Amino acid sequence: MKKFLTAITAVFAVTLMLAFHIPAKAAAADTLELKSKAAYVADYRSGEVIYSKNEDERLPIASMTKIMLLNLCFDKLDEGEFTLNDDITVSKTASGMGGSQVFLESDKRYKASELLKSIIVASANDASVAMAERLYGSESACVDEMNSKAKEWGLNNTLFSNCTGLPKPTQYSSAKDVSVMLSRLIAHKEYFNYSKIWTDEIDHGDRKTEITNTNKLVRFYEGCDGGKTGYTAESGFCLAGTAQRGNMRLIAVVIKGENSKSRFADVSSAFNYGFEHYTCKSALDSSKELAITVKVEKGVKKNVTMRPETDIYVFAEKNKRGDVSIDFNPAEKIKAPIKAGDKVGELIVYRDGVEIGRTNAISAENISRKTYFDYIRDVASNWTF
C-alpha cells in the first residue's frame, strides 16, 4: 500500500510541476519606489511581500485604526451578537465625537447596517463609538479588546488608545501590522457590501446625510474594492487598500504621505507593479476532483475519489522560473463507511522545494461498508463453470 501510494504521489507531483511551470520572460526594467514614509505591499493569499519600506516603524495611523474596530464588529456579527437589522441607540458621547462624522443624533436609533456603512464609507467617528458602545458597553472596553486582538495576531508594533484614530500620543501601529488587520477584515465577505460603495446616504428620519467613500480608488482604480484612509497632522496621509484582478488580490498600505493625492498615487503604483510583475495561479481547486484515488478497505468501491478541502494558489514573479509540486500523504487507515467531506489525507504544495500551503484531501463521495451479502456476491462473481 505504501509503495503504491508513493508511486502515485510521484506521478501526481510531476504532473503538476509540468502544469504549473512558470514561464520565463524578459526581466522588467522598472522598479517600485513609493514616496510615503512607510509602506507594505503583499499578496493577500500567500502573504508574500512585494515591497516594504520602514514597515515595522511605529507611527500614528489615524482612521486606519478603524480597521481593527471593524474586525471586531464583523466577528461579533458572525457570532450572532447582533444583526444588521438591529436598532442601536446612539449615546450623547457618540453623537458628540469630533472629526469625520455623519452627524448622528443623540438618543436616536439607527440600524447596525447604517452604522457600519458610516464607518466603512465615511470614516465616521460618531458611528464608530456607537458600535463600540453597543458591542462592549464602552469605548474603553472596546479598545481593550482591540489591543487583545492585536496581541493575539502578533502585532507587536500596534497599540490602541481609542477606536477612532483621533490623535493620542500612546497610539500607534506599523504598515506591516495594518496589512495584517486589513487582510483579516476582508476575509469577512459582508465587508465588501459596504466597502465598494462610492456614494450613498444615511437616513436620520427627518433628514439625510450624503456620504462619499474616502477611498477614491474604489471608483478610480480597476479592481479596488476595499480599504481605509486616514489623516491627522501627526500621521500624515495614510491609506490601506486592496484590489483584485483575476486570481490575484493585493494588499497595499502607506503611512505618512505628503498629501492626499500622493497616498492614492502610491497605492495605485503598488497595485500596478504587483499586477504587472506577478502571477497567481491555482494549484489546488476545492471544486474539482483530484487526478488520483486512494484504496478503501472494506468498501463497496475499491477506491475513493478526492478533492482539496480548500483552494491553494501559487504566487510568483512572472520573470522567474519556478516549479510547483504537490505531495499527498494518505491517512493511516481509510476504511468504509466514508462520507463525502471526510478527511482521507493531506495535500502539501511546494514551490521550488519550499512549502507554500497545505490542505486536507477529503472524500468527494459516500462509500458504504461491504455487507456479508456483498462479500458473497464478490466470491460468486469469480466462480467459473
Protein language model features and the residues they cover:
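Structural motif marking the loop-to-transmembrane transition
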Residues: 1-5, 61, 112, 369-372
